[in-house]
């Protein structure tokens, strides 16, 4: 699918370019051409609908709540989620921690909390907020935070 979209973009660019050895049209310097070229380049990358924050959260909660989720899918989902430029909402982390508990994977649960702390970066107020929101789940599932385990100290 991506390859087809790239082929369409390359084909549309070839239509705009002059033949090799031919002089560029004088209209290329006009603002109309630049606007057309800008619109054309935007079209190449703007297909598909945009997902709202609520839809994004629901998609990930549903993913981690699948009853047949295995350890590989859990790690794959977390790696994908970590790749986004955001800190996951507490409800997504809650679903991921519950998946860890279903899989009896304590190490992954602690690693998820470490990743959330890392994703919060220099914003020191985010991680305590997330732990505060997750505290009932952590207590229910018997999951310790990295700080409670002493993993935050070198």
Swiss-Prot record:
Pathway(s) where this gene product acts: Energy metabolism; oxidative phosphorylation
Family matches, as PANTHER family: CYTOCHROME C OXIDASE POLYPEPTIDE, CYTOCHROME C OXIDASE SUBUNIT 5A, MITOCHONDRIAL
Short sequence motif named SIFI-degron, residue ranges: 2-21
A GO CC term attached to the entry: respiratory chain complex IV
Chief location bin: mitochondrion
Transit peptide residue numbers: 1-45
TM annotation in the entry: none
Protein's recorded name: Cytochrome c oxidase subunit 5A, mitochondrial
Cellular localization per UniProt: Mitochondrion inner membrane
Keyword Manganese part of the UniProt annotation: no
Any single GO BP term: mitochondrial electron transport, cytochrome c to oxygen
Gene3D superfamilies: Cytochrome c oxidase, subunit Va/VI (1.25.40.40)
InterPro entries for the chain: Cyt_c_oxidase_su5A/6, Cyt_c_oxidase_su5A/6_sf
UniProt keyword terms in alphabetical order: Acetylation, Heme, Iron, Membrane, Metal-binding, Mitochondrion, Mitochondrion inner membrane, Phosphoprotein, Transit peptide, Ubl conjugation
Membrane topology: Peripheral membrane protein
Post-translational modification: In response to mitochondrial stress, the precursor protein is ubiquitinated by the SIFI complex in the cytoplasm before mitochondrial import, leading to its degradation. Within the SIFI complex, UBR4 initiates ubiquitin chain that are further elongated or branched by KCMF1.
CDD domains for this protein: Cyt_c_Oxidase_Va
Subunit structure: Component of the cytochrome c oxidase (complex IV, CIV), a multisubunit enzyme composed of 14 subunits. The complex is composed of a catalytic core of 3 subunits MT-CO1, MT-CO2 and MT-CO3, encoded in the mitochondrial DNA, and 11 supernumerary subunits COX4I, COX5A, COX5B, COX6A, COX6B, COX6C, COX7A, COX7B, COX7C, COX8 and NDUFA4, which are encoded in the nuclear genome.
Positions bearing N6-acetyllysine: 91, 117
Domain of life: Eukaryota
